[in-house]
């Protein structure tokens, strides 16, 4: 049997499907069966982590769920597996808290046996419900036509039926060719491979920080009332949410743009900074800078760059960013700042912007052997 890929690429796609009486009845029966299964496990399965717990649950619940709740064979298995996962999550939580209740109308579905999606006819077939049309879907749905379908979640909300399908594919094994480096900072993101081939992407940090400041000013204006007054609380929350959504949307778009730039420069390796110690001393920073650092979501941006790169068959490598903005990319000596974010090397005379210096240094680091990568110079850097 082939060994399973450790880190497959996954994407979740939400589709709006047709709502019918049979679908509503199916979801209602599933939720009732899920509630019953949870309380049955509380009484009969003292330790869900012990060996044979799933077999015990199957013996105790399978026939009962099928007959009393009129669930198809595979959906019955999905139901008690779903309940067991919820029960385990509660059981393994040290604080425990209240025993979980099921209110939201959601159904766990297994591909092929519980549901199938036909992307050509734009239909979904669900066991015991039948064929339903796909009414709405994202524009990039066709990109996942060759991906493997995994488990899905069917949700009823605000009179609409949403099917959230997880697609999965294995990472492509590619041979490294050329590479680009990405330098992320608060003003812009620079992508390139040298001081002539690079692109600057402005950030939206200023917009996000503006809405966060509006929320904080509102809280300062009403220091006691903002928690009790529903209108003030709602407005403050909306400002915070808007700031968060701006940066989340920006991070997703940057992932696509970086991959497009890399393809345009003929590279299939993207080098990112290893940010392990990014906020190690964050409490020592000024308050405004600290706020912007949290808002910027460096790791979120890197996550979407890495995800898009793997989706398009590229390699991502994390390299040490130490002194990448102040070391001369030509001779390795420490550079001197002669203007705002502009550095000069006293040894060889090279001058450039610190962001361009950073991508040149980052692109020369890493363990990958690239056919067109510049050779490392035998110079001891002045660190």
Curated annotation (Swiss-Prot):
InterPro entries: Cas12f1-like_TNB, RNA-guided_DNA_endo/Transpos. The keyword Zinc applies. PANTHER family: TRANSPOSASE, TRANSPOSASE-RELATED. One of its GO terms (biological process) is DNA recombination. It comes from Acidianus two-tailed virus (ATV). In the N-terminal section; belongs to the transposase 2 family. In the C-terminal section; belongs to the transposase 35 family. Keywords: DNA recombination, DNA-binding, Metal-binding, Transposition, Zinc. It holds the Pfam family Cas12f1-like_TNB. This is TnpB-like protein ORF383B. Zn(2+) binds at residues 328, 331, 345, 348. One of its GO terms (molecular function) is metal ion binding.
